[in-house]
Each structure stands twice: as C-alpha cells, then as structure tokens.
Regions:
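Conserved serine DD-peptidase/penicillin-binding transpeptidase domain
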Residues: 1-168
C-alpha cells in the first residue's frame, strides 16, 4: 500500500528514490496489487463557485492526497499540414495520460481563425479530448492541463518506476 498525504511538493524523482530504496533493500517482487491509499482526503475535490472552464488548467488541479509533479502535465499540439485535417497531439511517454484530438486545422490567415477556440474535455482515468480549431502554424502550440484523477496518475507513475527498477 502506497499512502499519499497530499504533499504538493512530491515529484516523480521522489517516487524513483523510494523505489530505489526498495531495490537496495532487496525487494524484487511485490505479491498482490499495489494499492494507492488516498483516504487522508475524503471530501469534495471541487469548491463551490470554481469556474468550470478553469478546472482543467494546471493552477486548478483538484486538491488530492496523491499529487505528483503538481498534478500537471504538458503536451504539444501540432496543426495538420492540410487545412480541414485533424491536428495532432504529442504527449511525452512518461505522462500516464491519454489525449485525443478532435481539433480541426484551419488555413493560415483564415477568417474563421478569430473565432477559433480550443477546449479540453476530461474523462475517466486521465483521458482528455481536445476540441475546437487551430490555425496552421509552423511551431507546435504548448499546452498544460491539470490531472483530474490523482490516485490513478500516481499509481501509474509508481507502477512504471517499479517496472523500470526491475521490481515485478
């Protein structure tokens, strides 16, 4: 059981160091499931009055017992080469999230561009769908989002670090 206490300064490197300590102690295998204990926080994760369109922004990550790297992740959105095609998203492999793009690429200088907006729809288990449109551009658009399920995120990071250390 991995108990998380809501420490907002916890980083992936801290989890890696913890796993290295297990490895040094001779742990090679964990019998059963790795459980993430977030019971220290048993209340609502959103306050009354929070603007709904801020909930996916990094500064608005839900309060959680399991926080790793501020429960924030970054992606790059690339416009398609051809107007009308779907833009694509690159997510670093070390982020245990899934992103889907429904973003339509507009021609550079398109009159629609002034009305073009992006929106993100969070789903279960840290799955996100990016919608809207993006004018063609030569450089990717950097974006950052708040993790919505801290326990799932922390658990996936812990499992990845255990696997990397050879602990099965």
């Amino acid at each position: 059981i991995a108990r998380f206490g809501g420490d907002p300064t916890l980083k992936r490197q801290d989890i890696r160091n913890m796993v290295a300590t297990l490895k040094k102690a001779g742990v090679q295998r964990i019998e059963g499931n790795v459980l993430i204990d977030t019971s220290v926080f048993a209340s609502h994760d959103k306050a009354p009055g929070w603007p709904w369109n801020d909930l996916t922004q990094c500064f608005s990550a839900p309060p959680a017992a399991a926080i790793v790297d501020r429960n924030c992740f970054s992606v790059s959105l690339y416009s398609a080469q051809k107007p009308g095609d779907v833009a694509f998203i690159r997510v670093a492999s070390y982020y245990p999230v899934t992103m889907f793009s429904q973003v339509r690429t507009l021609a550079r200088g398109s009159s629609e561009a002034q009305y073009c907006e992006l929106d993100v729809v969070p789903g279960d288990l840290n799955r996100y769908t990016l919608t809207g449109c993006l004018p063609q551009r030569s450089e990717p658009l950097p974006l950052a989002f708040a993790i919505q399920d801290g326990a799932s995120y922390a658990g996936a990071i812990l499992k990845a670090e255990l696997a990397q250390a050879g602990i099965t």
